[in-house]
Curated annotation (Swiss-Prot):
Catalytic activity field: dTMP + ATP = dTDP + ADP
PANTHER family, A to Z: THYMIDYLATE KINASE, UMP-CMP KINASE 2, MITOCHONDRIAL
Gene name, Swiss-Prot/TrEMBL: tmk
Functional description taken from the UniProt entry: Phosphorylation of dTMP to form dTDP in both de novo and salvage pathways of dTTP synthesis.
One GO molecular-function entry: dTMP kinase activity
Protein name as catalogued: Thymidylate kinase
Binding residues annotated for ATP, in chain numbering: 11-18
Presence of the UniProt keyword Kinase in the record: yes
EC number: 2.7.4.9
Keywords on record: ATP-binding, Kinase, Nucleotide biosynthesis, Nucleotide-binding, Transferase
Amino acid sequence: MKNGILISLEGPEGAGKSSVLEALLPFLQNYGTGLITTREPGGVQIAEAIREVILEPSHTAMDAKTELLLYIASRRQHLTERVLPALAQGKLVLMDRFIDSSVAYQGYGRGLDVADIEWLNQFATDGLKPDLTLYFDIDVEEGLARIAKSESREVNRLDLEGLDLHQRVRQGYLAILDKEPERFVKVDASQPLDKVVADSLAIIQERFGNPS
């Protein structure tokens, strides 16, 4: 049974969610019985191996359905091996991407049927959804420009996609925002990092209170 708190972070490329996640850690240590951070795809050995296959820049021939099914397989392994045990122990789990990425990227971005993706998500997660999703919204061109300037970020296959795909991905996220505004909360990611972190922390504290 789920006793902990699951918070996912979502956004288009270059939104800075990974940096925000790291900056939030000192403020969230006292929620639940502990705190873990993890990512999709990845988080455990099998899922990290799948991640390498998905993001390898040379895998340009990958079919959209193949890509989706690899993400779903990674998701299931990650959940059963790491996320669900942590939640059962009452921990706060911060996830860099989760189910909404599949809807935005493979649904809106690749043009696959969103209902099919939602069914696969349901199948892989047994219906688990985040208690809160922070969606970091940024203009697509600004986000991609950030990536181009970053010396530490390795280029992956999705970075090589055209602007049109990334625009569709953002529209997918905004569609989720319209559909699930209670769970899916927008943060303006074009602001300085410290302001984005402060806004994110305020949303978390409003939803779950201050840690005891």
